[in-house]
């Protein structure tokens, strides 16, 4: 045993927790260089992950600031993300529906519409980088079996793309 090394290891394993007035309690996951927490996004509980450099406190501040900017305008961002997902993925949702033998719904006579897709997806998780880029994961209410809808964007450039992943 090496007491000096053990002291360093003990210090490393101490939890790093930030109490933020807007974002709540954020806990650093040193293995993944992320702060994890829960936020209220448009009235719903959503997991928040801030991608940071664990050794650089300025990156913590930048990631928190970016997340707060998104949260402050969540209604606008939420609407835009849902609309982009609907625009990009409604046709694909109907293709999946046509191949789902267990679902009695016929996409020829009763297709999923953009409005329906917009309504049925719900944000479950948001990841924000210190540079202001973000990824939003949406539950897709079984429209894409057990996959998720992901929307990518940044504060500077707006929304980039929406995909199905998982």
Model-derived regions, located:
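Long, charge-rich alpha-helical interaction segments
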Residues: 52, 57-113, 117
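Generic detector of ordered, mature protein regions
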Residues: 48, 61-63, 84, 90, ...
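Contiguous hydrophobic, core-forming segments of folded domains
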Residues: 2-77
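Acidic, proline/glycine-rich low-complexity IDRs
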Residues: 1-28, 32-36, 111-166
């Amino acid at each position: 045993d090496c007491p000096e090394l053990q002291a360093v290891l003990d210090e490393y394993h101490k939890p790093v927790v930030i109490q933020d007035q807007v974002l709540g309690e954020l806990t650093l996951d040193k293995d993944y260089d992320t702060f994890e927490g829960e936020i209220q996004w448009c009235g719903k509980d959503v997991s928040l992950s801030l991608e940071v450099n664990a050794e650089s406190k300025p990156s913590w501040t930048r990631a928190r600031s970016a997340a707060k900017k998104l949260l402050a305008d969540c209604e606008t961002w939420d609407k835009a993300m849902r609309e982009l997902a609907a625009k990009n993925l409604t046709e694909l949702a109907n293709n999946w529906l046509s191949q789902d033998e267990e679902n009695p719904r016929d996409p020829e006579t009763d297709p999923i519409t953009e409005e329906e897709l917009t309504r049925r997806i719900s944000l479950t998780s948001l990841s924000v980088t210190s540079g202001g880029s973000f990824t939003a994961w949406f539950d897709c209410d079984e429209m894409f079996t057990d996959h998720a809808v992901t929307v990518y964007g940044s504060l500077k450039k707006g929304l980039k793309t929406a995909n199905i992943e998982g």
